Amino acid sequence: MQEPHDQEPIEKQKLPGMDDVLETEHSGTVAGNTERAGEDAAPSLEQQLKEAEIRAAEHHDAWLRAKAETENIRKRAQTDIASAHKYAIDNFSVQLLAVMDSLDAALATENSTLENLRDGVELTRKQLAAVFEKFNIHTIDPQGEKFDPHQHEAMCAVESDFAPNTVIQVMQKGYMLHDRVIRPAMVTVSKAKGT
């Protein structure tokens, strides 16, 4: 008989075949835990995928709406620009109607004298000048000024006592709209004698 102190406690004793049983239990537990963990993780990934697909669809829908809105704004802007070009002189045209009315009234007058016709033409010219001023149309009348190719068109050059390249005669006045020449003044320019 063995003494009680010589015996190993039962828990620490190795029994034959115990290693195999412990190993099987341990690997089964680990495998079971892994399967359960995989089952728990899989729905989470599927759920995340569904949520991502929903968000992607929402973003795609918002993008399509923004694209359509941008296209509508572009078309509206093109229409507005075309309309602005088409009717740009609308207000100017209305102002010119008063000038036309004055000319019609002058022509409708019977037995008018030359003096009355002249007065009527002067009045009509003043009306037209007022319309031009209102719309920033300015006259280019360069008599005696230095020739400027940006505002004047030289029809001919004549020997003169004036300094070379001086406008000595205005054949037709020019006009500017704001700071843009809409018609250059047609002029005769001086040139040095003997050239």
Curated annotation (Swiss-Prot):
<dbReference type="GO" id="GO:0042803">
    <property type="term" value="F:protein homodimerization activity"/>
</dbReference>
<dbReference type="InterPro" id="IPR013805">
    <property type="entry name" value="GrpE_coiled_coil"/>
</dbReference>
<keyword id="KW-0346">Stress response</keyword>
<comment type="similarity">
    <text>Belongs to the GrpE family.</text>
</comment>
<keyword id="KW-0143">Chaperone</keyword>
<dbReference type="GO" id="GO:0005829">
    <property type="term" value="C:cytosol"/>
</dbReference>
<feature type="region of interest" description="Disordered">
    <location>
        <begin position="1"/>
        <end position="45"/>
    </location>
</feature>
<dbReference type="InterPro" id="IPR000740">
    <property type="entry name" value="GrpE"/>
</dbReference>
<dbReference type="GO" id="GO:0006457">
    <property type="term" value="P:protein folding"/>
</dbReference>
<comment type="function">
    <text>Participates actively in the response to hyperosmotic and heat shock by preventing the aggregation of stress-denatured proteins, in association with DnaK and GrpE. It is the nucleotide exchange factor for DnaK and may function as a thermosensor. Unfolded proteins bind initially to DnaJ; upon interaction with the DnaJ-bound protein, DnaK hydrolyzes its bound ATP, resulting in the formation of a stable complex. GrpE releases ADP from DnaK; ATP binding to DnaK triggers the release of the substrate protein, thus completing the reaction cycle.</text>
</comment>
<dbReference type="GO" id="GO:0051087">
    <property type="term" value="F:protein-folding chaperone binding"/>
</dbReference>
<dbReference type="GO" id="GO:0000774">
    <property type="term" value="F:adenyl-nucleotide exchange factor activity"/>
</dbReference>
<keyword id="KW-0963">Cytoplasm</keyword>
<dbReference type="InterPro" id="IPR009012">
    <property type="entry name" value="GrpE_head"/>
</dbReference>
<comment type="subunit">
    <text>Homodimer.</text>
</comment>
<protein>
    <recommendedName>
        <fullName>Protein GrpE</fullName>
    </recommendedName>
</protein>
<dbReference type="Pfam" id="PF01025">
    <property type="entry name" value="GrpE"/>
</dbReference>
<feature type="compositionally biased region" description="Basic and acidic residues">
    <location>
        <begin position="1"/>
        <end position="14"/>
    </location>
</feature>
<dbReference type="GO" id="GO:0051082">
    <property type="term" value="F:unfolded protein binding"/>
</dbReference>
